[in-house]
Amino acid sequence: MTNVPWLTAIVLFPVSAGLLIPLLPGRGNHIVRWYALGICLLDLILMTYVFGCYYNLSDLPVQLKEDYCWIEILDFHWRLGVDGLSIGLILLTGFVTTLATLAAWPVTRNPKLFYFLMLAMYSGQLGLFASQDILLFFVMWELELIPVYLLLSMWGGRRRLYAATKFILYTAGGSIFLLAGLLTASLWGSNAPVLDFEILSHKSYPLGLEILIYLGFLIAYAVKLPAFPLHTWLPDTHGEAHYSTCMLLAGILLKMGGYGFIRVNMELLPHAHTVFAPWLVALGAYQIVYAALVSFAQRNLKRRIAYSSVSHMGFVLVGAGSLSDLGLSGAMLQMISHGLIGASLFFLAGTSYDRTRTLMLREMGAWASQMPKMFAMFTTCAMASLALPGMSGFVSELMVFFGMVTSAAYSPYFRAIITLIEAVGIILTPIYLLSMVRQMFYGSRISSVSVFNNIDAGPREVFVLGSLLLPMIGIGIYPNFALPLWSAKTQAVASLVQPTSILYSQTLYNIQ
């Protein structure tokens, strides 16, 4: 036990240090980028030290609790804590943000504002994953949008304003449902708002009301995940954003939707979850195949990778809807795995653009001989994305696959149909990924497009990709590097929905 407010320090340190950026000397980006990288690295070291020394993997309850009254009249507390659902995502946030800051080295336009926004986004994401108060969760959910919008609208492609506006409209629209859901959940059956996650988890609601609350939360999280049909902001956003911003979007922001769905919908509203679970499984399976087909039709490199993200996040829906411990644990691992893989692919897409000034696949070709290191790294990351054995994606998708197959909540016919659809999606994944690699690095050279900067990957790029590949391979070879972080918690959450799920499987959803 410790009385030191470690989590408050971890959450507030990046944005607090970022406020000092305007005081840094010089107009160039040399000092500010080293300063921002140092802040991210120090925060990553701090969280690693704190979790290593003070977090006990075998303890199920929330640990490192902090509770400070913020707005007394609303009973609004600065309430932080860490458990199995959040610790892995907090570490992922620190790791990916540090590498994204290093990836943003070439940014030269208004670097002070750029790096401050990255640090502010960093604090917002850490605060969301560490929140143990549902109103604080909402505040962090909203505050994190501001730096994302500015990063999208000020640094990116020609249609960046359109993409940023579409992003903010989708997410703000989803936030309305999130706010309505949390107000209803916190005020129901009490004279004062109940905002503590731990207390809310013991509240009960009439089933009809619980379903309405669940639906409001589901819409908000489906936008961020993203889930079909609320996914259309993602390809536009990734297509226009700077690749360091894309690393943060794919690596962390999408995981906010999956985390909120498991933390709130499953843990606080288990009865409603059993009602929606079959539909979530069906939606996730459809999304895996649909996004894979649409990805194959994309001719823009970043849009193809964006749709691959939509496809891979479908496994999170299937795992959460499987109502099994194995499936839910696989969904958690899928979020970690995709955070690493998505960040690596968008980084490679951006560094390729820096050299060629094109993202159109039809204008690429025969780059393998010119950039052999880039070719090797791109191919390796594509293999990780298509769930090659020995990579983290293989383990996570296999866990979701078997979690659905072995789920006692559904009939054999329903499980067989979903498994078949998932298998089709798994087969489609190498088709669009390997064709992408072929168009970029094989074939004939397009005469109208040449490599402007005919320099292969440098030490900085090799370091960023190597750092992302190490945990992908490590988890793929030995999954217990990551699984113990959340295994006890996912078992507890799955146990909340399994008893009632058996009843529902025998009545409403027993498809014969």
Curated annotation (Swiss-Prot):
Question: What residue intervals traverse the membrane?
Answer: 4-24, 34-54, 87-107, 111-131, 134-154, 167-187, 208-228, 242-262, 274-294, 308-328, 330-350, 374-396, 417-437, 462-482
Q: Which EC numbers characterise this protein's activity in its record?
A: 7.1.1.-
Q: Which keywords, in A-to-Z order, does the entry hold?
A: Chloroplast, Membrane, NAD, NADP, Plastid, Plastoquinone, Quinone, Thylakoid, Translocase, Transmembrane, Transmembrane helix
Q: How does it sit in the membrane?
A: Multi-pass membrane protein
Tell me the superkingdom of the source. Answer: Eukaryota
Q: Which GO terms describe its cellular component?
A: chloroplast thylakoid membrane
Which is a GO BP term held by this UniProt record? electron transport coupled proton transport
Output one GO MF annotation: ubiquinone binding
* Reactions this protein catalyses: a plastoquinone + NADH + (n+1) H(+)(in) = a plastoquinol + NAD(+) + n H(+)(out); a plastoquinone + NADPH + (n+1) H(+)(in) = a plastoquinol + NADP(+) + n H(+)(out)
**Alphabetized InterPro entries for the sequence:** NADH_Q_OxRdtase_chain4 (IPR022997), NADH_Q_OxRdtase_chainM/4 (IPR010227), NADH_UbQ_OxRdtase (IPR003918), ND/Mrp_TM (IPR001750)
> Which subcellular locations apply to this protein?
Plastid, Chloroplast thylakoid membrane
* Any Pfam family: Proton_antipo_M
- Which family is annotated? Belongs to the complex I subunit 4 family.
Name used for this protein in its record: NAD(P)H-quinone oxidoreductase chain 4, chloroplastic
Native organism: Zygnema circumcarinatum
